A protein has these predicted regions:
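Flexible loop/turn segments at secondary-structure boundaries
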Residues: 83-86, 119-121, 144-147, 180-184, ...
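Active-site phosphate/pyrophosphate-binding segments
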Residues: 161-324, 415-447
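Helicase-primase coupling helices
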Residues: 299-385
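Extended, charge-enriched "interface" segments that sit outside catalytic cores
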Residues: 1-69, 339-345, 349, 437-447
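C-terminal helical cap and adjacent loop that interface with cofactors, partners, or active-site loops
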Residues: 366-429
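Structural beta-sheet core signal
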Residues: 77, 136-138, 174, 267, ...
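Glycine-rich phosphate/diphosphate-binding loops that line cofactor/substrate pockets in enzymes
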Residues: 59-73, 125-134, 252-263, 314-319
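Glycine-rich phosphate-binding loops that contact phosphosugars or nucleotide phosphates
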Residues: 65, 69-240, 427
Length: 447
């Protein structure tokens, strides 16, 4: 279960204010639980942990087993935004930090494509595919989103040229709409196996659907434990009490923002395994809250690394932020610092200590320094990093996001702003149907 500690904010806010925002948070909680708020047709994520059928989990595992029998050692997962960040986060968090160099896991390497339009990246992906035994998961509800569609066209061509059309079809799985769209049509024509992106689950809330479950199980991890951890968190957050961690988090972040003008939230971790937790979290909160000229800007750092760069700004820069630290209470590994007879580095005072003890003291020292410097700090903690705790963490942040956005007064489940750049890009690429926009944008650029 995820725990929260808001004590690092207590010297910055009044108790009466926090109680007021707890009341606002409980009102928003009621809206979310009653499914009566804006965007209530996109609440399918709420019960995924408790309602995901065994048949779906087994189907994901069947793909894993089939590709293992085909000796697949590279899976290219194609998707953008919520179609890849959750899976990327889980795989990075659960993998050996040097898995690529060691190649001892027994599971295929999972790489991601379709999340950018870099020609160098795509070209280097082709280089990798030419020397590996490849399969592909393509994730797109429509099949026409530019970045993943471009990547899939290229990967599909490689698979068909390398293995032939029939074998290529066995090496492609599509995660897409149940009934419509270009990718669904192509999958039916070519005979690809398909999984469904539920209509009532938005992309950034989709990590516990096949969008996340399939890549995670292909990477060799236990999606049953992931769902079990999320289910326990679902049950915990269903209890309406002042110890509801999601309510506490949503209340404090909105209090700091609305009353004290803290416009930036920095998600902090003290392990590089959580770098992509920050990326997933930024999309979740940025797209859910950043609209109607409102929102808290989500940023992320990995300490102690970033203490030697952004730490200066956090300590002494503009007082526009607060921190939310994701704490891992116990390490999965054990390394003890040894003694050195010469002690030239003057570290013998640490001899016999675990490296994680040094990390914990760095975390505590940073907390005290940043609070002294005027930066409020919340702490979200899990017992250790594994599939179960990661599932709980995913669900916690998703649920809290819904509550927080309703406090803010915005629809957590739409993202109207992401279409603006696409319209300009289509006009500049002279996509059919955009002739008038092309003419207008060319005139604008010639001024």
């Amino acid at each position: 279960m995820v725990k929260i500690n808001v004590g690092g904010c207590s010297s910055f806010v009044k108790d009466s204010e926090y109680k007021e925002y707890l009341e606002k948070a409980f009102a928003a909680y009621d809206v979310l639980e009653s499914e009566s708020g804006a965007g209530n047709d996109f609440l399918g994520w709420k019960h995924l942990p408790s309602q995901t059928p065994e048949s779906l989990v087994k189907a994901c595992e069947d793909v894993r087993d089939d590709w293992k029998n085909r000796n697949v050692d590279l899976v290219v997962v194609i998707g953008i935004g919520g179609s890849y960040l959750g899976a990327k986060c889980a795989i990075e968090a659960l993998s050996h930090s040097f898995a690529r160099e060691m190649r001892q896991s027994g599971a295929p390497e999972v790489v991601f494509a379709g999340n950018n339009l870099s020609e160098e990246y795509v070209s280097e992906l082709i280089d990798l595919m030419t020397v590996r035994n490849v399969a592909c998961v393509v994730i797109s509800k429509s099949g026409t989103t530019t970045e993943p569609a471009v990547a899939f066209r290229i990967v599909k061509q490689h698979l068909e040229e390398t293995y032939g059309q029939k074998e290529a079809a066995a090496r492609i799985v599509a995660v897409t709409d149940a009934h419509k769209g270009a990718l669904k049509t192509l999958s039916t024509q070519e005979g690809y196996r398909t999984f469904v992106v539920p209509d009532n689950v938005g992309g950034r809330f989709s990590v516990l659907t096949p969008v996340g479950l399939l890549p995670i199980v292909l990477a060799g991890f236990d999606i049953r434990a992931l769902l079990e951890g999320a289910k326990e968190e679902e049950m915990a957050l269903a209890e309406k009490s002042e110890k509801n961690a999601a309510v506490e988090y949503a209340a404090m972040r909105n209090l700091l923002h609305s009353v004290y003008g803290k416009s930036v939230e920095v998600l902090v971790s003290f392990t590089p395994k959580f770098q992509y937790l920050g990326e997933w979290w930024k999309q979740l909160y940025g797209e859910s809250e950043g609209k109607d000229k409102k929102g808290i800007y989500p940023a992320s750092v990995v300490y102690t690394t970033d203490l030697h760069s952004l730490g200066q700004f956090v300590q002494d820069g503009a007082r526009i932020m607060y921190e939310t630290v994701v704490t891992v209470e116990n390490s999965n590994r054990s390394v003890v610092i040894g003694s050195d007879p010469q002690n030239l580095d003057q570290l013998n005072y640490l001899a016999g200590q675990h490296v994680e003890h040094c990390n914990a003291m760095a975390q505590l020292g940073t907390k005290l320094a940043h609070i002294d410097g005027g930066v409020p700090q919340m702490e979200v903690s899990i017992e250790r990093i594994n599939e179960k705790t990661l599932g709980a963490l995913f669900y916690f942040f998703e649920f809290a996001c819904g509550v927080s956005a309703y406090i803010l007064g915005v629809n957590p489940f739409n993202q109207p702003g992401v279409e603006a750049y696409k319209k300009n890009m289509f006009a500049l690429l002279e996509k059919p149907g955009f002739e008038e926009q092309t003419k207008a944008i060319k005139a604008r650029l010639s001024e």
